């Protein structure tokens, strides 16, 4: 029987262990940031251990970075964590994309941009959304601080092999529907736990037609459907994205020859298989307190089916039967490792251009990396957003999570391009609605959610 992409990647990296039991995997790339690494570095220090492969470790600042002025860090804990990463990287010989560096940004954007993320690798990071890197034909998954220390010391990690799931996606995306809507649809349809215990491969006509940035959006949110890993087979789109980047292989032809073997064999079988027609999708909006609680724009919010729904409606200040258009928005956030890439900002700017943010909205655009910010400014996107009334910020995780000054006030609804809408995720009492960048941009200039498939409803002015 043939092998799936996941089987091939996994088997390449097993150092020790029997089938059915936890196995020791070799780690090709360890990405770190300021929040989950300090304890791990201290553990090495206490045991007088070296960091085994500093050349396979790369650090950046993202979670705690204040995006209004990256050097004006008021929070003492954040300042201490950032300073600790600077000290630790210098002591242990780790390459650091420091504050103000041309490579600084959200860790899951910096890896691909620099060419560190490549097909065939096992990539780990002390962050839930490491599955983003699976878009390149790699295994990427998040780990805890104790596991970060283990990788520091050994360049390996113990893992139980998950089962395999294949999600086949075919059909052309309708106008106004994006990669973000695909993953929100999957989670709303099958639930936040459907991928638990699985490594998911997304494939099919729709995936093949996507850019790498779109593919990363889908893999980024694999964890929100319960899967530890999400991945896609590499192809010419992948190879051309990696080619010429700072850490791309010196012999690209040789690398590509190997990467082309990273495909699921025709006779391979997944443990679970799902088929999806992308051509019938609508823009999605979440109404509740996890990504499963979402609806197509044309649908009303569902009836209460259990205590979780009851609690979600209470927290969000909404009721069954309402529609997304009725939500009284106060904030719009375009950013995060899900949707802060150049193509995301270009699509948002296309909608924003010539319009103004409504008076009831505070709108932020936060490029996910310095590279994206520089590229956006080189083509004038910053001017489009600023003229429309958006705040144009420095790169960082920003309003995706309440660990820096960018937070949504208590009780306020926010249209957000991020990946999680948990209670308090964007600040105490914040009410988060997950959407695509286009939906967020249109909401900012209309003051509420609209059906972006109908261009006539995109208005401007205050």
From Swiss-Prot:
The lineage of its organism: Bacteria, Bacillati, Bacillota, Bacilli, Bacillales. It comes from the Bacteria. One of its GO terms (biological process) is L-leucine biosynthetic process. [4Fe-4S] cluster binds at residues 337, 397, 400. Pfam families: Aconitase. Coiled coil: none annotated. This is 3-isopropylmalate dehydratase large subunit. PROSITE patterns: ACONITASE_1 (PS00450), ACONITASE_2 (PS01244). Pathway: Amino-acid biosynthesis; L-leucine biosynthesis; L-leucine from 3-methyl-2-oxobutanoate: step 2/4. It catalyses: (2R,3S)-3-isopropylmalate = (2S)-2-isopropylmalate. Binds 1 [4Fe-4S] cluster per subunit. Its EC number is 4.2.1.33. It comes from Listeria monocytogenes serotype 4b (strain CLIP80459).
